[in-house]
């Protein structure tokens, strides 16, 4: 079976990390809308909720915000990743055991993975999640998930950061406006694919990037960068 084209000749897969409400979903929508419309994506949370509707034994985990067993989580990831390359999954890995499984999986398949980690203050998370008015987003569950994330996430990043042969890591500030987060993501992608001449050029004029309110990015810069990256991806696809 022929190997599928990589993202920018560099990555087989993207894993998106961070707390629920930190801006992961918005980043994915921007990626699909502006840059990678055909990227295969999945949220572990969405998959769990679908499965809990079919399997009562899983419903307790989603209702109480408890982590789903690692063997179930890793199995769901592996199944999705093998069928959808290049692709993206939101919410995996969430603890050290899952991170070790991801390392093993990447090594077995000779994959290079882009890790996108979004950090966000609890105040912003609460504001966003309660506005969603979803059943499993009540305040007690939000705090419980936040506590779990603070306890488990450092070990995940430690494991992945120790394997630069398999992973590239981008860290994003989810407290900022979603347009700024997306721009930061794109600039980091350009840096990682060694297009530093563009990355450095954008620092010349802040006015080129920021609108008059000084809080949001001029949409033209995101459209330009996405067009630029898409043209590279298309040329690479045509050569395969």
Task: Pin down the residues of each PLM region.
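Glycine-rich phosphate-binding loop of ATP-dependent small-molecule kinases
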Residues: 1-240
């Amino acid at each position: 079976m022929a190997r599928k084209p990589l993202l920018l000749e560099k990555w087989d897969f993207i894993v998106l990390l961070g707390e629920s409400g930190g801006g992961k979903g918005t980043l994915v929508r921007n990626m699909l809308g502006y840059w990678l419309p055909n990227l295969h994506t999945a949220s572990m949370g969405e998959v769990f909720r679908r499965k809990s509707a079919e399997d009562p034994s899983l419903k307790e985990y989603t209702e109480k915000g408890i982590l789903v067993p690692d063997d179930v989580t890793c199995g769901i990831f592996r199944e999705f990743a093998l069928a959808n390359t290049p692709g993206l999954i939101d919410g995996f890995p969430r603890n050290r055991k899952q991170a070790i499984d991801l390392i093993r999986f990447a090594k077995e398949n000779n994959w290079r993975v882009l890790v996108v980690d979004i950090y966000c203050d609890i105040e912003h998370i609460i504001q966003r999640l309660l506005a969603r008015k979803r059943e499993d987003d009540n305040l007690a569950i939000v705090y419980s998930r936040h506590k779990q994330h603070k306890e488990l996430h450092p070990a995940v990043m430690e494991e992945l950061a120790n394997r630069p042969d398999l992973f590239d890591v981008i860290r994003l500030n989810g407290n900022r406006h979603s347009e700024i987060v997306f721009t930061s993501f794109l600039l980091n992608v350009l840096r990682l694919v060694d297009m530093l001449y563009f990355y450095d050029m954008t620092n010349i004029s802040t006015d080129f990037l920021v609108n008059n309110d000084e809080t949001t990015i001029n949409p033209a810069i995101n459209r330009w960068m996405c067009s630029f990256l898409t043209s590279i991806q298309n040329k690479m696809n045509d050569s395969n």
